[in-house]
């Protein structure tokens, strides 16, 4: 479903846990405009105040920032605007804790090595009764269901392929392991190895694809405005993936339950269409009022 300003809209209240933000593009790009709106949801326009993190891929390396303070107040979050870091793949997360204490080790995104590459993962949801990993090689450092699920996924991939397989083999394997993990609860996530970005939706995830002709974008959370035509070149392509739309005048695509998207170099190279499903309130807090189509 594509959401845009030409639709008839209504306001409604949604309960969510954490929120996710990802960016994949074909030229190094900063995420400041999107992140400045996103971080306001950590205590100002929403209640995701239990820490934040953001990871930038730089070649084969990853520059990662985390804080157990709310992103809206964190001086570490201020650095993102000041330093204007550019990257091809970025993953950010603001936390509303469901499992695990509020501390650095439980703050997303999480990072693991797979086939000699850094893999970065952030999750929105609540997973219960995950498989026991006591005897597994990869262990979570913190106490979140999210990190445990990522470790399970990473170990599954390493056990399935001794050497790095093709991208489509990776995509298919991630679909398979995700379907099993999603049986344990809500499993929205964004995942990247610096070459591509994969997103999976259980309940709420949206994306927008920006390319020429570029125009103005108006943020939802603080009415900030940017004219991308001043900054972007004709061949630039940028995908933004997030829990809820960050702008009110762009055409956002809503993913459905069980849906996957695979982005690389600013292009959507593969997609699995999900099935519309009514969201079930599992008791977690995090109320969000947004515009949506009817």
From Swiss-Prot:
Residues 18-266 form the Glutamine amidotransferase type-2 domain. Its EC number is 2.4.2.-. Keywords: Glutamine amidotransferase, Transferase. PROSITE patterns: GATASE_TYPE_2. InterPro entries: EgtC-like, GATase_2_dom, Ntn_hydrolases_N. GO terms for molecular function: transferase activity. The keyword NAD does not apply. This is Putative glutamine amidotransferase HI_1037.
């Amino acid at each position: 479903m594509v959401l845009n300003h030409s639709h008839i809209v209504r306001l409604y209240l949604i309960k969510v846990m954490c929120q996710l933000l990802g960016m994949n593009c074909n030229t190094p790009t900063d995420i400041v405009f999107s992140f400045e709106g996103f971080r306001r949801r950590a205590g100002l326009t929403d209640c995701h105040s239990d820490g934040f993190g953001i990871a930038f891929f730089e070649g084969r390396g990853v520059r990662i920032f985390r804080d157990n303070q709310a992103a809206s107040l964190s001086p570490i979050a201020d650095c993102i605007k000041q330093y204007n870091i550019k990257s091809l793949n970025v993953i950010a997360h603001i936390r509303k804790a469901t499992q695990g204490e509020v501390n650095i080790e439980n703050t997303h995104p999480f990072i693991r090595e797979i086939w000699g590459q850094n893999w970065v993962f952030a999750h929105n949801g609540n997973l219960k009764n995950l498989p026991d990993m006591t005897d597994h090689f990869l262990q979570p450092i913190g106490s979140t269901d999210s990190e445990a699920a990522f470790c399970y996924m990473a170990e599954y991939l390493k056990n399935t392929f001794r050497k790095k397989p093709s991208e489509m083999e990776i995509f298919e394997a991630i679909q398979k392991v995700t379907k099993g993990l999603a049986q344990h609860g809500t499993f929205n996530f964004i995942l990247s190895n610096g070459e591509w970005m994969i997103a999976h939706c259980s309940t709420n995830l949206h994306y927008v694809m920006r390319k020429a002709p570029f125009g103005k974008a108006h943020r939802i959370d603080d009415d900030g405005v940017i004219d991308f035509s001043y900054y972007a070149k004709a061949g630039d392509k940028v995908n933004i993936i997030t829990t809820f739309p960050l702008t009110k005048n762009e055409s956002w695509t809503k993913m459905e339950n069980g849906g996957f998207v695979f982005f690389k170099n600013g292009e959507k190279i593969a997609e699995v269409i999900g099935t519309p499903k009514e969201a079930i309130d599992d008791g977690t807090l995090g109320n969000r009022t947004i515009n949506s189509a009817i």
